[in-house]
Amino acid sequence: SKDEAKKDDSKGSVYYLNFKPEVDKQWQKIAKAYTEKTGVEVKVVTAASNQYETTLKSEIAGSNAPTLFQINGPVGYESWKDYCLDLTDTDLYKNLTDQSLAVKGEDGKAYGIPYTVETYGIIYNNAIMEKYFALDGAVVKSMDEINSYDKLKEVVEDMTAKKKDLGIDGVFASTSLKPGEDWRWQTHLANLPIYYEYKDNKVSNMDKIEFKYAENYKNILDLYMDNSVSEKGLLGSVDVATSMAEFALGQCAMVQNGNWAWSQISEVDGNTVKAEDIKFMPIYFGVDDENEGLCTGTENFWCINSQASKEDIQATKDFLTWLTTDSEGKAYMYKSTDDGGLGNAAPFTTFGEDERSSDPLAVEMYKWMESGKTSVSWNFTTFPSQTFKDDFGAALLEYANGNMSFDKVEKQVVDEWASEKG
């Protein structure tokens, strides 16, 4: 029977080193299904959380090295380029919705292909917003009118003044500044000033930055902290989970996070946010508000091991073609994790409207991607290091506690960037 499809060595085999422990079960199921269908062996090994680079280093040096692995972007490519196959002539690259998303070498060729895109912005609970619009004296009557930083600030401050009427403890969820829980500010929010500075200079990386848009960054961070569920002095003990629970329980109207957050929100005990009420708006930054979309990108790029055998390379290409063009393969890609799929928002033209995640924040992401607005690209993969980000986060906590001026925070960011990149 097809359940006993024999392994056929002449067909080559696939070995995928998977980055995401949360979808290991799904990948094992995919591997089995593909082997049963084709007779080609597919092995999936999942690295432990935060151990991917270490695992890849030891595995790639072994006699049975992964034929398929992942990198996080241009920085990861620099470390692994000796093992990245040129994918420019593959269906995988040709079928990308936006080829600028691929990781390219200095030769302009594609070496890393994004298999899912993600986005982040300001998530809001539309039910609370509608309640606000109906109040006497509300400064706007619909979300369409909130289209700039200035307008957002005006609305947020008015909502804070009316929070008793709205039944909320703050407009924004608490700004989690606990060490290790501060990535939304030292990475995601910090991406915006860097994105605009790179854009002004027409580059995708810089050895030294001016932190030209530090003031814009400070403004939005202050807006979050001054209109939040928690007092500034308490933010050092707040983690992301607490912040997301505040949103889920209806204690606030807005929270900065990404499309991956819906599962966190919906799984909170006592969640009050309905799927049809969870929406996205851009993190209006006061630079190019009329054109700014959500922050859309990925840290998930597939690479094929250029040092694998010719047969294994072909088998791996075929496996990826199946995942992105065959109806069965595509179903594994886009179906939600509850439904046995990977829940990927696959950026390929081969996926039809009905082959997209029905997750409400994924639906919002596609809506914004197709709105004609300019997506803010993910440039935080070019930040100097984890230490740089951790130090930035620690400085933000000192700033929140009133122990450090923002000028000092700004100086630290500029100095550490230069010394680490130099």
Protein language model regions, located:
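C-terminal capping/gating helix-and-loop segments adjacent to ligand/active sites or protein-protein/ligand interfaces
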Residues: T296, P360-A418
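Glycine-centered hinge/linker elements that transmit conformational signals in sensory
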Residues: E154-E157, N201-S237
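Extracytoplasmic/periplasmic substrate-recognition and gating elements
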Residues: K37, E41, G62, V229, ...
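Extracytoplasmic/periplasmic solute-binding protein
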Residues: K109-Y115, Y120, D150-M206, C252
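Extracytoplasmic "Venus flytrap"/periplasmic binding protein-like
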Residues: A33-Q99, K109-G112, A127-A138, E246, ...
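Short, solvent-exposed loop/beta-turn-alpha elements that line the ligand-binding surface or hinge
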Residues: T88-A102, K141-E145, S176-P179, I194-N219, ...
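Hinge/lid segment of periplasmic solute-binding proteins
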Residues: N72-E130, R184, H188, D277-Y284, ...
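Short, low-complexity disordered leader/linker segments with a strong preference
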Residues: S1-V14, E36-K37, E41, D91, ...
